[in-house]
From Swiss-Prot:
Keywords: Cytoplasm, Hydrolase, Protease, Serine protease. It catalyses: Hydrolysis of proteins to small peptides in the presence of ATP and magnesium. alpha-casein is the usual test substrate. In the absence of ATP, only oligopeptides shorter than five residues are hydrolyzed (such as succinyl-Leu-Tyr-|-NHMec, and Leu-Tyr-Leu-|-Tyr-Trp, in which cleavage of the -Tyr-|-Leu- and -Tyr-|-Trp bonds also occurs). The lineage of its organism: Bacteria, Pseudomonadati, Pseudomonadota, Betaproteobacteria, Nitrosomonadales. The keyword Hydrolase applies. The keyword ATP-binding does not apply. The gene is clpP. This is ATP-dependent Clp protease proteolytic subunit. NCBIfam families: clpP, PRK00277.1, PRK12553.1. One of its GO terms (cellular component) is endopeptidase Clp complex. GO terms for biological process: protein quality control for misfolded or incompletely synthesized proteins. It comes from Nitrosomonas europaea (strain ATCC 19718 / CIP 103999 / KCTC 2705 / NBRC 14298). GO terms for molecular function: ATP-dependent peptidase activity; ATPase binding; serine-type endopeptidase activity.
Length: 214
């Protein structure tokens, strides 16, 4: 059966286009077009979608710093739909969230796994949310290295040090003990929205716009 739209047959490859919607705003000065993410940034909304990489982390950090410079008193809203990614990239975002003056409210849409879950719980206390059917997954950091035995030992020590630090931070934000975090992240641990609230990863499940953005 021939697909309704064949990119190759029609001579159009849309893979790299992104298909990002544009928003047209009209004012006394005329019309202005924004991509949807730039328009939402004006409302102090940032998206972390997909893997946490150095590139995506730098984009989030830049937006956090920009919004702080625009207004250091108003909350920032970070929407997360991520399977996780680089620990160091995630820690860079985490440190920025803690560093800037505005509260950062986090919201899981879809999934927040691994480093995505870590950043979800890093939001301001009382302002961390999940949507009803979102999923959260926590586990210990993953790593692999090839080389001489002495180099492997060095990298193994680094992974263990990162694991210890991540557990301490998770314990701080969830209210769990470090031992509980170590136990519960030993293997992939999936939680629904309500279970994430009970564990302390988030503060509430949002079913409608009951929480008004400032």
């Amino acid at each position: 059966m021939q697909p309704m739209f064949d990119r190759e047959r029609n001579g159009l490859d849309t893979t790299g286009l992104g298909l990002i919607p544009m928003v047209i705003e009209t004012s006394g000065r005329g019309e202005r077009a924004y991509d949807i993410y730039s328009r939402l940034l004006r409302e102090r909304i940032i998206f972390l979608v997909g893997p946490v990489t150095e590139t995506s982390a730098n984009l989030v950090i830049a937006q956090l710093l920009f919004l702080e410079s625009e207004n250091s008193e108003k909350d920032i809203f970070l929407y997360i739909n991520s399977p996780g990614g680089l620990v160091t990239a995630g820690l860079a975002v985490y440190d920025t969230i803690q560093f800037i003056k505005p509260d950062v409210s986090t919201l899981c849409v879809g999934q927040a796994a691994s480093m995505g879950a870590f950043l979800l719980t890093a939001g301001a206390k009382g302002k961390r949310y999940c949507l009803p059917n979102s999923r959260v997954m926590i586990h210990q950091p993953l790593g692999g290295f090839q080389g001489q035995a002495s180099d492997i030992e060095i990298h193994a020590k680094e992974i263990l040090a990162l694991k210890s630090r991540l557990n301490e931070i998770m314990a701080k934000h969830t209210g769990q003990t470090v031992k509980a975090i170590e136990r519960d992240t030993d293997r992939d641990n999936f939680l629904g929205a309500e279970a994430a609230v009970k564990y302390g990863l988030v503060d509430a499940v949002l079913t409608s716009r009951e929480v008004k953005q400032e």
